[in-house]
């Protein structure tokens, strides 16, 4: 493991997807993609409905990079604060930056970005991993993320969708249908999306 087994396990919250199941989804996505031979340090995993980041923490544990989109400000803050506490407790060298993101000329989201490494020597040499926690609408993925920047996309849809957008509850099918073009644009050719829902799509 690139970081400790406890990274995805310590953060507890209502609605958290089972870690073993989420890890299986990551394995499925990688196996179905064109990136099995790609070195871990180059793989970018995106959770477009990230919640508090279980999928991203599992990706980091493997040595991948992680980027998450989440509409809930409280969830993004909790994930960012947790990551800060974890890195500091384990004395892992890191740099955190917080910034606003622009969508069509207006502030469309905020990003908490962590750059860290498994050793001080690797950090100094630039051999690092990145976690990006973006508070923004997943339907704006094409504006919030660069085209062809993600190798794998893994999410547990109900947790993200139940947050709604702008104070309203959106259907799972409606939200995903609206988000799909943007998701497709940020996936690299050969990339794979894997989404789980216990509900039935229309």
Regions found by a protein language model. Name each.
Residues 1-202:
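Class I S-adenosyl-L-methionine-dependent methyltransferase catalytic core
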């Amino acid at each position: 493991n690139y970081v400790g087994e406890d990274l995805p396990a310590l953060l507890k919250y209502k609605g958290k997807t089972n870690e073993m199941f989420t890890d299986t989804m990551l394995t499925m996505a990688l196996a179905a993609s064109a990136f099995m031979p790609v070195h871990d340090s180059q793989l970018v995993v995106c959770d477009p409905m990230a919640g508090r980041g279980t999928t991203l923490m599992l990706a980091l544990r493997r040595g991948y990079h992680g980027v998450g989109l989440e509409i809930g400000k409280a969830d993004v803050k909790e994930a960012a604060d947790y990551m800060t506490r974890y890195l500091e407790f384990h004395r892992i060298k890191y740099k955190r930056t917080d910034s606003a993101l622009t969508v069509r000329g207006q502030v469309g989201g905020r990003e908490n970005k962590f750059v860290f490494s498994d050793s001080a020597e690797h950090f100094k040499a630039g051999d690092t991993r990145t976690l990006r926690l973006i508070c923004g609408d997943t339907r704006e993925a094409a504006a919030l993320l660069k085209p062809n920047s993600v190798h794998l996309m893994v999410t547990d849809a109900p947790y993200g969708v139940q947050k709604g957008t702008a104070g309203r509850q959106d259907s799972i099918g409606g939200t995903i249908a609206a988000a799909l073009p943007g998701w497709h644009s940020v996936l690299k050719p050969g990339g794979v999306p894997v989404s789980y829902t216990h509900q039935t799509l229309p």
